[in-house]
Amino acid sequence: MLLPVRIPILSTIISKLFAYRPILRRLTSTHCIVARPVRAPENATELTSSVILTCRDEEENIEGLVNAIPQLGKHTEIIFIEGHSKDNTVVKIQKMIKQYPEKDIKLYKQSGTVQGDAFQLGFDKANGDLLCCLEVDLAIDPMEIGQFWDAYVSGRGEYINGTRTIYQMEKKSMPFYNFVGNRFLGNIFTPLLGKRFTDTLCGLKAISKRNYKKIRSNMKKFGGFDPFGDFPLIFAAAKGGLKVAEIPVHYRPRQYGASKAYEKSFLTFYKNAWLLVKMSWIESCKCTSL
């Protein structure tokens, strides 16, 4: 109840229209807390992992990435999702498959053109117990994936989101307006979802295959709005009751090629950001817990 005094008709209208809205729901007189048992630590030696890598025109980064990905659990699957490259990215990946037969490297080509489509294809194709998503630009050291593995195995998080805004970045890692935009979106998402977010567009994130299957249907509610693929995953994880954890990662300039995320103009970036904020507000009120 948002209006503590009973006023015929008005009390009902206010409660129906506003009481469940983000931020305003914190002002209601009734609060529900849902608790569950603490998840016991997983046996890391029995778990497997899949590292999903989205790439487009990243020929020079492929081999360094393959060599840098750590072994997680008893088996690590490396999945490349290629997005219509104009250079020799596909040829390079095929070469890595032949050159490193001891590594379980797989290549799939996305039918769509946006990163969200690539991530979803990777999630669906992956066979590991823990799914880690990483962009191929080497702006984040692949060794940092180990922190996400440890967080999941220990029970610290069920959806683990990387954040680039905690540690000091190397120069020219991220345009200033993108940094401000990321912090702004984080400040919007925190009260909307009741989970702390300082970076909503980090290229490194992790979720178990089991939990992904649980929230996949809710992700479809947001897929048409977000071309990046981050927001559907964040919303579905938070609304699905998953334990969210943020892990700081070091961020540096990409090693090769041009950034796909920052190639648009200042105004275009914020136009898209505003669209996603509106989507967040509307859909967060409609999305129900699983």
PLM segments and residue spans:
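Hydrophobic helical membrane-anchoring modules
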Residues: 8-54, 60, 64-67, 71, ...
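Donor nucleotide-sugar binding loop of glycosyltransferases
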Residues: 58-61, 85, 141
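Active-site acidic Asp-centered loop
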Residues: 83, 134-136
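Acceptor/aglycone-binding surface of glycosyltransferases and processive sugar-polymer synthases
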Residues: 108-125, 130-133, 142-223, 254-270, ...
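A conserved acidic beta->alpha catalytic loop
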Residues: 82-91
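Conserved S-adenosyl-L-methionine
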Residues: 1-5
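Conserved donor nucleotide-binding strand/loop of the catalytic core
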Residues: 76, 90-125
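Short loop->beta transition adjacent to catalytic acidic/histidine clusters or analogous donor-positioning motifs
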Residues: 47-50, 70-80, 102-106
